[in-house]
């Protein structure tokens, strides 16, 4: 069995599994609630305005859809994201080893084929589950609300934030760019469970470790005097609205660190130390 066949098997297992459906359901419940509670009332009343701002403007897509409307729904979504991305498939490397399924694969293909295919499947499911609810919410809100490019003081995005110049001129390009970035970061976050799988002997630790790590990072990075380190707090990195400024250097560090850890602690050790 070559890499292409192995990858096909892993992707089918990942995207047809119950875990993937559960993650999408969790994200969609939050997305739909936000749409019903925030978007629909604004769409029902065209003269609705946002109160308490320096400049009041009619509600529109750029300050009402879930990712740009700072409220409990988006906050909950960000906090649950580390769990949402791992539920679909991140724990299966651990369970495959425990159930002996991996022995069947190793008898039919090279270890590296299985390990890389698993990594890609986990990465893709994590990215998809993190972005699909946001994309659907954006599309639904766009169907019922106007798209107004408003003055800086009336929009949630920090004027000094990353790509803010794009947001205040071409907001949809900004959304696409940030959703792609979120896809990558969420996918990599899910792969942390693969790394942990080689070092622990408990399924719940494998499942919950990314969430615990994110909360730990949220606390610890706040102690730093360096803005790039502060910017690596997950609650900031996954916040598209940038109420706290994001920095491109923080994303580069985040991506490089997880890629290096994945290459060394998962791929290299997986190939060397897995014993059939």
Give the predicted meaning of each segment:
Residues 195-202, 270-275:
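Membrane-interface helix-boundary motifs at transmembrane edges
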């Amino acid at each position: 069995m070559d890499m292409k066949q192995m990858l096909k098997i892993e992707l089918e297992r990942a995207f047809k599994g119950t875990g993937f459906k559960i993650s999408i359901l969790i994200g969609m419940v939050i997305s739909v609630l936000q749409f019903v509670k925030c978007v629909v009332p604004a769409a029902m009343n065209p003269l609705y305005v946002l109160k308490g701002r320096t400049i009041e403007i009619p509600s529109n897509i750029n300050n009402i859809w879930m990712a740009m409307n700072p409220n409990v729904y988006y906050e909950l979504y960000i906090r649950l994201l580390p769990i949402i991305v791992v539920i679909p498939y991140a724990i299966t490397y651990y369970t495959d080893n425990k159930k002996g399924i991996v022995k069947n694969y190793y008898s039919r293909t090279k270890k590296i084929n299985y390990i890389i295919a698993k990594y890609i499947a986990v990465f893709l499911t994590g990215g998809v589950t993190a972005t699909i609810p946001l994309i659907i919410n954006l599309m639904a809100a766009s169907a019922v609300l106007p798209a107004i490019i408003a003055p800086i003081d009336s929009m949630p995005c920090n004027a000094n934030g990353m790509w803010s110049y794009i947001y205040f001129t071409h907001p949809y390009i900004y959304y696409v760019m940030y959703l792609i970035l979120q896809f990558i970061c969420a996918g990599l976050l899910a792969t942390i469970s693969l790394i942990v799988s080689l070092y622990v002997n408990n399924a719940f630790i494998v499942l919950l470790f990314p969430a615990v790590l994110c909360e730990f990072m949220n606390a610890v990075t706040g102690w730093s005097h360096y803005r790039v380190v502060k910017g690596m707090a997950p609650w900031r990195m996954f916040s598209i609205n940038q109420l706290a400024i994001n920095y491109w250097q923080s994303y580069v560090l985040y991506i490089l660190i997880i890629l290096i850890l994945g290459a060394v602690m998962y791929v290299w050790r997986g190939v060397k130390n897995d014993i059939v």
